[in-house]
Amino acid sequence: MTLYNADDYGITARQAENIRRCRGEGCLTGVSAMPNSPYLPEAMAAIAEDKTLCVAVHINLTEGLCLSKPSDVPLLAAADGRFYPSFTRLLRLSVTKPKALHTQLKREIAAQIDRVLPLLAGRGLRLDGHQHIQMIPAVLRAVRDVLSEKGLTAEYIRWSCEPLSPYLRHMALWRDYPPVNVVKNLVLNTLGLFSRRYMRDMGQKRGAVMGLVISGNLEYRLVSALLPDFERYAAKRQKTLELVMHPGWGVEPGEGLDAPGGIFEAFYKDPARRREYDCLMKL
């Protein structure tokens, strides 16, 4: 089974509408909703009747404003409530201040689940992470504890350990794999060695993902060439395959969750967002 997922759903009304077009006119089967977006209620209302669309809570600890009181989560956000935009900072704090971080992670993750849960319109709870932060062991541990304390069970949690073997089979495409993405892939796979115990605790089967090594370059030419190998990889291991994409074009400067001129603003206005949108329309 292959899931075609759009991350970052609901950052703006236009961005959410463009993602929904990938559902109505393309092959999209799931979205990951940004819990701290002011447009979340509107975006979720627009998909409330589409019961077969998978909807995940896109746990976000790096972009926009926290949902907790800023003074309650000082390791995660500045005094104005804006998240520190750093995966590596979270990773470092998980080593240097594990107890304080665990308390604050639980508080913010609980707040984000609480905001999205009533808007799921009867769907089961699904979880993943913005910038794949759920792969940090401390974050996944906090997710486990929040679910346990709330008496919740997730029907799916994304496992962002992407296999490299399907990429290596296509030597003609190697130049299309940004070296920094290969490094990120290896980092996430390494973190997975320490995080998988928490997946077991939650009764989660580790699935497969595609799209990390070519993140920012998920155009139809590459995806159509690589997807069959990823599907064979997943089928052989009886895993669900999730194609992770960001087709939400249309976020204008100053409209997103990030501060104007921030690192995420450049990502949303990148032409690659439109290419990923086009890819989902063609697959």
Predicted segment positions?
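Terminal accessory/targeting
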Residues: 1-3, 13-126, 136-283
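Active-site metal-binding loops of divalent metal-dependent hydrolases
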Residues: 8-9, 131, 247-249
